[in-house]
Amino acid sequence: MNAYVRDSESVYSESYPPENFISNEPEKSKDKDNFNGEEVISYVGEVETVPAKEENVFRRFINGFKIEKNQQDSAGQGLKRRLKSRHIQMIGIGGAIGTGVWVGSSKSLYRGGAASVLIDYCIVGTMVFCTVYALGELAVAFPTRGSFVTHATRFIDESWGFALSWNYVFSFIVTIPLELTTGTMMIKYWTNLNSGIWVTVFIVFLFFINIFGVKGYGEMEFIMSTIKVVAMCGFIILGIIIDCGGVPTDHRGYMGTHIFRENAFRHKFKGFCAVFTSAAFSFSGTEYVGVAAAETENPAKAFPVAVRQTLFRIAIFYILSLFIVSLLISGADPRLTSYHGVDASPFVLAIKDANIKALPSILNAIILISVISSANAQLYAGSRAIHSLGCNGFAPKCFTLVDREGRPLVALLILFLFMFLGYLVETGQYDTVFDWMLSISGLGTLFCWGSICLAHIRYRAAMKHQNRSLKEVGFVSPFNVYASYYAFILVCLVLAAEFYVSIFPVGGKPDASAFFENYLSAPVILVFFICHKLYYKTKRITLSNMDLETDFAYKTPVEEEEEEEKSAGSLSIKQRMKKLSDMMC
C-alpha cells in the first residue's frame, strides 16, 4: 500500500513499513492533475521520483488561454490575486492624474474663474476622500469581483445593482475608444499622419499589455503612474519658478497673485455650478482601486495604505497644481476655449507664455501617456465590470469565462471589439457621435460614488442590527458613517448642479439638445432600474436579511495582534514614522 505526496515538481511514492507489504508487484496510479492521465509506476519497497513534465515558454503561454475549469471561488470567480501593494497604491495615484486635470481644467478655469476652481475642487476633493474611505472599508471586508457594483446589489437593491452595473459598462464601451481618439489628437501636435494608423497602434499596444493578465496591467500602470507623478511634481516646481519671475526667457517678471485675482469668479453662480460638475468628472477613475480588490494578494494590507494616500493625492495633484496654473493663466484667456486638445491645456499655455521652447512638446508626451494610462485602466475596470455582470446573473453566463491566467476573455473581447469605434476619428462629426453615446452613461461616475456611500451606510446599519462587531473587519473608516452621509449629500448636490447647468448653460440659452447630452443618463438608469424591478419583482433588502457572511474577510490573527500593539501604544519610533509616511505619500 502506497501513499502519494505531491509537490509542484514531482510525485513521491512512499512505502509503509515492510511488515505491511503484501507483494512486490508494481502498483499503478493515475495522477490527472500533474500528468494529464499518464501512468505513474512505483514499486512497493522503493522510493521513485518522477519528474513533472516541463513546458516550454511558448506552450505555457498558449495553455494560459485555456478556460479555467475550477471557477468556484465565489469572491474572485477565477480571477487571480496577483496585484501587490505597490500596484494598488500607484493605481490609486494614476487614477488621480488624467486628461481631466491636464486638459479638462481649461473649461473649468474659463467658466468659473480661478477662485471657483479652487473652492469647487476642494469641496469635491473632500467628497472623493470620504467616498474612497467608504470604498476601502467595503473592499477589505468583501474583496469580491465587481467591487462596488456587487456591494450595491447586496446592500442597496438588486435592481439598482443591475442598473448601475450596465450603466458602468456602457461608460467604458464609449470612453475607451474616445480615449483612443484623444490620443490621436495628442500626436497631431507633432505630425499630421493619418489618425486611423495611430488608433491601430493604440489597440495593438493595449492588447499586448493585457496578454500578460492582471500583472501586466499592474506593472504598466505602475510605470505610467510614476511618470505622471514625476511630471506633475516637476510642473508644480516650474510653475512656482515662473510665477516668481525666475525663468530667463520670460520677460514678465514677478507675477504673484495678480492673474489669480483677475476674474476670480467668472459667470457668478452659474459658473460656480459649472465648475462644480467639471471638478466631479475630473476625479473619475479614483474608484478603480476598488475594482482590483478581487485580484489583490492582500487587500487588508494594501487598501488601507492606498486609501490613506487619497488626501495627499488630492491636495498635491489637484488643488496645488490647479492653484499654481491659475497664478499663470487667466480664466478670461480666450485660448482656453478657442484652441483644441493639448493646445488648450492651461499647463501647456503657461509653459508657452514663459517662452520655454522644448517643454510644451515634453508635456504633450506626458499627456499622451496619461491618455494611454487612462485607456489601460478603463480596459481593466471595464472588463472586470462585464465579468461581474455574468457572475451576478445580470448577463449571459459566458461573460464569466476566465482563462488559466485569470483573464476574463469574453469581457476583454467585447471591449476590444468596441475599440474599433475609435476609427470614427476619420469622420468629420465623430465628436458629435461620441457626445451622444457618452450621454447614455455620462453621470455614471456620480451614480457609482453615491452608491458606494449609500452601500457603506446600509452595511454599517446592518452590522449594528445583526450584532456584528467592527473589530471583525481588517480596515474601518476612521470617520465612521458620517463621512459617507456627507459625501452622499454632496453627490446629490453635484447632480442638482449638473441639472441646473444643463438647463441654463454657461454663456448660452436653454437648449433641449444640450440638456439631453448632459443629463440623458439619469432617466436611462432609472428605466433600467424600474424595468428590472417590475420584471423580476425583486424584494427589498432589509437590515435583517442583508447577507453579511458571503465573501466576508475576517480579520486575521496577525492583524489582531498588530491592532493590539497599536492600542497598547507599543509602536516604535520607526513604526510611527512608517505609519505617518503611509498616510501622507
UniProtKB/Swiss-Prot annotation:
Sequence ranges of Low complexity compositional bias: 10-19
Region Disordered, residue ranges: 1-34
Topological category with respect to the lipid bilayer: Multi-pass membrane protein
Keywords: Amino-acid transport, Endoplasmic reticulum, Membrane, Transmembrane, Transmembrane helix, Transport
Transmembrane segments: 90-110, 122-142, 160-180, 194-214, 222-242, 272-292, 314-334, 362-382, 408-428, 437-457, 487-507, 512-532
GO molecular function, one term: amino acid transmembrane transporter activity
Name of the protein this chain belongs to: Uncharacterized amino-acid permease PB2B2.01
Similarity comment: Belongs to the amino acid-polyamine-organocation (APC) superfamily.
Topology feature Extracellular, residues: 111-121, 181-193, 243-271, 335-361, 429-436, 508-511
One biological process term in Gene Ontology: amino acid transmembrane transport
Basic and acidic residues: bias regions: 25-34
Residue ranges that the UniProt entry lists as topological domain Cytoplasmic: 1-89, 143-159, 215-221, 293-313, 383-407, 458-486, 533-585
Chief location: endoplasmic reticulum
A Pfam family this chain is assigned to: AA_permease
Organism of this sequence: Schizosaccharomyces pombe (strain 972 / ATCC 24843) (Fission yeast)
Gene3D superfamilies: Amino acid/polyamine transporter I (1.20.1740.10)
Residue ranges that the Swiss-Prot or TrEMBL entry lists as coiled coil: none
Record localization: Endoplasmic reticulum; Membrane
Cellular component GO terms held in the UniProt record: endoplasmic reticulum; membrane
